[in-house]
C-alpha cells in the first residue's frame, strides 16, 4: 500500500506543480526536488485498497479502518517534514508560539515572492546583532497545530478501536476529527 501511495502523492504534487516540471520531465522522478501531496497518496491508496479488497473478497471498510492509524502517523511525520523544509506555515504572529524563519532562507531558495503575495513581509522583523542586520519573519507554526491535532485524533482512535461497533467507524472518526481541525 505504501509504494502506490507514494507514487500517487508524487503524481498529485507534479500535476499541481506542472510548470516546474514541464520543461524537465526527468525531474519528476527526483524526489529531492519538490515534494509529495498527501491527497494524491490517499486517493491512490484507496484505489489500491478497493481493488485488493475486491480481489481478496475482504471488507473494504474494515481495511480502511486498519489503514486509518497509519495514515495519521504519516500525516504527523509529514507535518514535521514541513517544519524541516520551512513550508506550510501560517500567517504573521507575535504570539508565544511564533516560529521565526530567517529571510536569508527564502532568498537562498528564491522563495521571497511567496512571502510578498501572502503579506507576511509587511511584518518583517530586523535586528542588529554584532553589527550585522538579521531579518526574519514570525509566523504561526501550523504544522505544529496540525501535527498535535492529528496526534490527538490518533490517540482517540487508538483508545476507541476495541469498542467500535461497525466497520468503517474508525475511518468516520478520523474524517470527522480531521475535518473539525
Q: Where do the protein language model's features map onto the residues?
A:
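A feature for loop-to-transmembrane-helix boundaries and adjacent hydrophobic helices
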Residues: 1-181
